[in-house]
């Protein structure tokens, strides 16, 4: 079981449905809108603080179970 981490949204493109999160330590992580845990429109804004679980995806590290904090 992975530990939750925190980070900052680097950027997120609503039209394409993905972006990147800069964790407190380590390299930037890919984030897809399906990984965002919220009701309604799933989006993030640049500079938002988030918590997430880092997992290895097909193309590298990505954020899952993303929550705005």
Swiss-Prot record:
GO terms for molecular function: DNA binding. Induction: In response to low temperature. Pfam families: CSD (PF00313). It is found in: Cytoplasm. InterPro entries: Cold_shock_CspA, CSD, CSD_CS, CSP_DNA-bd, NA-bd_OB-fold. Residues 7-66 form the CSD domain. Keywords: Activator, Cytoplasm, DNA-binding, Stress response, Transcription, Transcription regulation. Gene3D superfamilies: Nucleic acid-binding proteins (2.40.50.140). It comes from the Bacteria. The keyword Cytoplasm applies. Its main location: cytoplasm. GO terms for cellular component: cytosol. The keyword Transferase does not apply. Affects cell viability at low temperatures. This is Cold shock protein CapB. The lineage of its organism: Bacteria, Pseudomonadati, Pseudomonadota, Gammaproteobacteria, Pseudomonadales. The gene is capB.
